[in-house]
A protein has these predicted regions:
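Short, small-residue-biased leader/transition segments that mark boundaries at the very start
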Residues: 2-3
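A structural signal for alpha-helix termini and helix-coil/disorder junctions
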Residues: 31, 35, 70, 74, ...
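Short aromatic/hydrophobic contact patches that present stacked aromatics
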Residues: 50-54
Length: 192
């Protein structure tokens, strides 16, 4: 709502949230070389809770990240900008690791939450990439990896084109509104 009042539109298309399943936590700890324990989970697993914010344009990603960073009810621990620095696979998204206070009856526990912010096109690519790699258990053939990176480049071009188109639409709308105001002023001046 605050963003909508400031910018005349809501950049958020949708939000997804999830809590990592216990068996996924155990697998991840083993992959990292740690025993399954509460202490290891708290110390080494940063994405037990996750929120994905999917927005329209790449410019929205950075505006939303800035707004999230200014929230006084959470603390930003780290940021990974996979948009400016994509993963080798072609994955692009903006990740923020934050701590959020959880109020219990007798104490407050700061809990890590991973926030991912991406465009609809990035989300589409990431969803399909995840399914493909899951089928190959992380060992996709080289040609599939190359094709995925190529598709990631196409997604980037699409995002850039849509952002450019949106900016052109906003400029045309502003010019149209300015012309209407001039016409109204000219009419009012003639009537005097």
């Amino acid at each position: 709502d605050v963003y909508k009042r400031q910018h005349q539109y809501n950049p958020i298309e949708y939000i997804k949230s999830r809590i990592k399943a216990p068996e996924s936590i155990v697998k991840k700890l083993k992959r990292y070389g740690y025993d399954s324990s509460i202490d290891n989970m708290v110390n080494y697993i940063n994405d037990i809770a996750g929120i994905r914010i999917v927005c329209s344009f790449t410019s929205d990603i950075y505006r939303l990240a800035e707004m999230i960073g200014k929230q006084n009810d959470l603390t930003v621990i780290s940021v990974k900008d996979y948009i400016r620095h994509p993963k080798e696979s072609g994955y692009k998204s903006y990740h923020m690791l934050v701590t959020v206070p959880i109020f219990l009856s007798d104490c407050i526990i700061d809990t890590k939450v991973e926030i991912q912010i991406r465009t609809m096109a990035m989300d589409f690519w990431a969803s399909l990439e995840h399914k493909i790699y899951y089928k190959f258990e992380g060992n996709a053939p080289g040609y599939i990896s190359r094709d995925l990176r190529e598709c990631s480049d196409i997604v980037s071009m699409l995002d850039a084109k849509m952002l450019s188109l949106n900016e052109a639409i906003l400029e045309a709308k502003a010019a149209q509104e300015a012309a209407l105001l001039r016409e109204e002023k000219d009419r009012a001046d003639k009537e005097k």
